Amino acid sequence: MLCLAVCTMTLAQAQDQLKVITFNIKSFENSNFDVKPFAKLLAEENADIICLNEVENRSARQMDPKTLKYRDVVQDLAANLKLFGVFGYSYNLMNKKGDEDESKYTFCQDELYGNAILSRYPILNINAMQLPRPANSADQRGVVTAEILLPSGKMVRVACTHLDHIGGQMEQAKVLVGSNVLSATIPTILTGDMNQWPGTEVIKLLDASYDRLCQEGKTYQAGSKLDYIYGSKGAFEVVEKRIAANVCDGVTLSDHFPVISVIKFK
């Protein structure tokens, strides 16, 4: 009876604990668009939720050289890791600057660029939306969200975003804070490359709105902390947090490092 109680408690604790990774993968460029090194690196971490930025999906330079067909690299990576995967596009690569009607490019679902979420557990609801694009920003940015059903029966919402690297980050962050992207009714995890370092007004806004759940220290090779994991206020406790290596089999996979947090529900 004691063993059953202990085992049940341990299982319940494990079900309420999540290992989360956020990683800007630089479009798979450094591996010549081969997802396998990324799959190997990420498989070693055995995470429950993986959020990816700078995801180039179904693009011409990712075509299968034998069949010359577009590849859904998000689903390729998800299959390699035996995870569920969703992709939310921010813009079409053929229309990067947004000078024309975006709708004419998106019907084919090819040449897309955005963010992705991979999950060990079933994804029930998905949403993707574009963020504001002020005149001083470089690219159209977006956020993809997924509501995930955990084994314990609890729901968690995961939002993966990538703010602009030139300007407009405050306008984009205000939309994240003010919209229903981060639901007040479902515990939410916000991840991504915010392109802002600690102490900036954008990060002060996010810090005031959510609990920061990630390790301090540089996440970008140039020396800045740009990548973050946040959670709904008071919803999560940090069990472990660190910044991991970005090298697999001697290949530096990105100019960013994976940011890893193990969290549990309070």
Which residues does each predicted region cover?
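Nuclease and nuclease-like effector domains acting on nucleic acids or nucleotide cofactors
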Residues: 6
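Active-site regions of metal-assisted phosphoester/phosphodiester hydrolases
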Residues: 2-3, 12-49, 69, 84, ...
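Acidic/histidine-rich, surface-exposed loop or edge segments in extracytoplasmic proteins
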Residues: 22-24, 51-60
